[in-house]
Amino acid sequence: MSPKIRETLYYVGTLVPGILGIALIWGGIDAGAAANIGDIVAGALNLVGAAAPATAAVKVNQQRKDGTLTTSPVDQVTRGVEQVLAAKQNAEAEVERVKQALESAVNGAVPQLGPLASQILNGIQPAYSQPFDPHTQPWNR
């Protein structure tokens, strides 16, 4: 169905009830005749309206074939990048939560060990990170 035919049907469906109302007010037709004409027009438009899903399906098929409904490659890439950035933010938030949980667990455990144990734990990394020098004594390494 062409756009012009659809437009015409919409106008007819809009104008007929108004014309019938004016004719009824001016006395050109009685209420029974207006109701009958209105029923006939409404029935005809309902038959046309029943074809609306088929018309819509044909129109969507045309739009799909000519590429109206497909997204451009730029839009696809943009959406993909946005999804990757969102996933990155979620992963960073998860890592931060794990870090906080570990820090709270370690910080909670160290004060319970006492000050001497804290000094030992804090000194482990510097002690093992010193380079080996065969001229130093074992007690001074």
UniProtKB/Swiss-Prot annotation:
It is a multi-pass membrane protein. GO terms for cellular component: host cell plasma membrane; membrane. The chain crosses the membrane at residues 9-29, 37-57. Keywords: Coiled coil, Cytolysis, Host cell inner membrane, Host cell lysis by virus, Host cell membrane, Host membrane, Membrane, Transmembrane, Transmembrane helix, Viral release from host cell. The keyword Transmembrane applies. GO terms for molecular function: pore-forming activity. InterPro entries: Myco_phage_holin. Its main location: host cell. Homomultimer. Self-associates to form a pore. Accumulates harmlessly in the cytoplasmic membrane until it reaches a critical concentration that triggers the formation of micron-scale pores (holes) causing host cell membrane disruption and endolysin escape into the periplasmic space. Determines the precise timing of host cell lysis. Participates with the endolysin protein in the sequential events which lead to the programmed host cell lysis releasing the mature viral particles from the host cell. Belongs to the Mycobacterium phage D29 holin family. The first transmembrane region undergoes a helix to beta-hairpin conformational change, which is responsible for its self-association and pore formation in the host membrane. The coiled coil region is required for host cell lysis and for cytotoxic activity. The C-terminus determines the size of the hole. This is Holin. The gene is 11.
